[in-house]
C-alpha cells in the first residue's frame, strides 16, 4: 500500500484513492481506523531521503559541470544563483576548451590580460566554431584549399599550397591568411595576414553554416615599395620557387602572369565554401583523400579522390583556366581492369592505344544497348584484384607473366610509352593495377569540354597516375599526408551534395 500511496501522492494512513473510490462509506471509515502494520511497507517508508544537487559541495559541482558540453552550461546557469556563481569558475571552462577544441596551452597566462577561459570559450572558440575545417575559396577557376584550425589561443586560416612543380612527392606548403584572437581585448580581434607587413585589421562574416567571407580593412599593407613588379617577383618565387627568366616556355609564362593578375585583385577579400573529406569504406581500392597531381604547364594541383560504388572520381580542389576547380578531372571504371602488355610492348604507344580504345568501344556498345546505363555496384574495387575484366583481347606471353606478377603482390613492371610526356620523370617503375578511365579536357575558359579515354595506374597506397591518351601526357599523383580536423562529412549524402555544389559553381 505504501508504494501505491507514493504514486498517488498520499500517505499510507489514508490509503489508496483508487481503492477508496471502490469502497462504501462504512468500509472507508473502517479502513482509515486500521493501522498499517505491513513491515515491508514500513521499510520502504523509512528509506533514506533524496539528496538535492544544491546540497552537494561546490568542488563536486565544479567537477560535474566541467564534464558537461559547454553548450549546455548557459541553461544550467539559469537554474539558480548558486549554479550561476559556480559556472564562473575558470576550471570548468579550461576543461571545456581542452576537450572540445584541443586547447592545451597554459591558459593561466590569460590572467595577465584579464581574459578568462570562459571568455576564450564563449567569445572565440564557440563563436567561430562554424568556420573550423576545410574550405574552398571562390577565386574563379583557381580555387584553393583553406584549413581553419584552433592553434593555441588563436583560430588561424591556413592556405595549403602544392609543392613547387614538378616535385609532387614533397610535402604541402602553407601560409596564414587570417587569425582571430582574444589576447589584447575581451572581444575577438580578426587580423588579415596577407602580404609582408605583418598582421593588420580584418573582418570575418559568417554568411551561413557552410559559407563565410573575409575582408581586409587595410589593403595598403599588401602593397610593396617596388610596385607591382616586385609583388609579382615575390609571388612567383613563393608560388613556383623560381624566377620568370627560369621559365622558358612562353605559354607557361602567360599562364603564370594570368594567374597573378587574377588572384591578386581579390586582396584577401574572399568567400569560402565548406568541403568535406571523402568517406572511407573497407572495400575501397585505396584510402580516399587529397592528392597532389601534375598538370603540365599549369603546374601542380590538388585533387580529391573518392569512391562511388564501381567508380572512382578525382575532383579538382584547385584548378586552372582550362579545367576549373570543382570539376571532375578523372573518372575510373573499377570494373574494367586493363592488363598492360610486357615492358617492351608497353613502350609502343600504338599498342597501349589499341588496348584502351578497344575498351572504349566496348563501353560505347554497352551504353548503346542500354547495359551500361546503371552499372552494378559489385564487384567492389577490392574484388578487382582477381582476373582482369574482358578487354577484347586475351593476354598472352609477357602479359600473362605480368598478370601473374601483379596477382602475386610483386607488382607489374611499368614504363611510359615513347612519346608520352611527364612533368615528373621520377615515377614508380612498378604498378599494382590498371583500370580504364576518362579524363576531362577543354579549351581555355572551359570551352568545349569533353571526356577522353585514358589509363588509371595504381602504384601503391599513396601514389597513382593517369595516362591521357589523346594528350599523350602522364599525370602523377601523390597523397597529401597532412591531417585535417573537423573535415568529415556528416553523411555520404552530404558529401555527394558538396561535390555537386562545387561543380555547379564553375559549370
UniProtKB/Swiss-Prot annotation:
InterPro entries: F-box-like_dom_sf (IPR036047), F-box_dom (IPR001810), FBXO31/39 (IPR045048)
Locations listed in the record: Cytoplasm; Cytoplasm, Cytoskeleton, Microtubule organizing center, Centrosome
Main localization, broad class: cytoplasm
Gene Ontology MF: a single term: ubiquitin-like ligase-substrate adaptor activity
Coiled coil: none
Pfam families: Cyclin_D1_bind (PF12014), F-box-like (PF12937)
Sequence ranges of Acidic residues compositional bias: 33-42
Domain of life: Eukaryota
Biased composition range(s): Low complexity: 400-412
UniProt-annotated stretches for the region Disordered: 19-42, 366-417
GO annotation, biological process: anaphase-promoting complex-dependent catabolic process; cellular response to oxidative stress; DNA damage response; mitotic G1 DNA damage checkpoint signaling; proteasome-mediated ubiquitin-dependent protein catabolic process; protein ubiquitination; SCF-dependent proteasomal ubiquitin-dependent protein catabolic process
GO CC annotation: cytoplasm; neuronal cell body; SCF ubiquitin ligase complex
Domain F-box span(s) in chain numbering: 50-96
Pathway: Protein modification; protein ubiquitination
PTM annotation (Phosphothreonine): residues: 37
Residues at which Zn(2+) binds: 192, 200, 216, 222
Chain positions with Phosphoserine modification: 33, 264, 448
PROSITE patterns referenced in this protein's UniProt entry, alphabetically: FBOX (PS50181)
Motif DDL motif boundaries: 283-285
Keyword Manganese assigned: no
Keyword Coiled coil: no
Assembly and oligomerization: Part of a SCF (SKP1-cullin-F-box) protein ligase complex SCF(FBXO31) composed of CUL1, SKP1, RBX1 and FBXO31. Interacts (when phosphorylated at Ser-33) with CDC20, promoting ubiquitination by the APC/C complex.
Domain notes: Zinc-binding is required for the structure of the protein and facilitate folding.
Protein's recorded name: F-box only protein 31
Gene that encodes it: Fbxo31
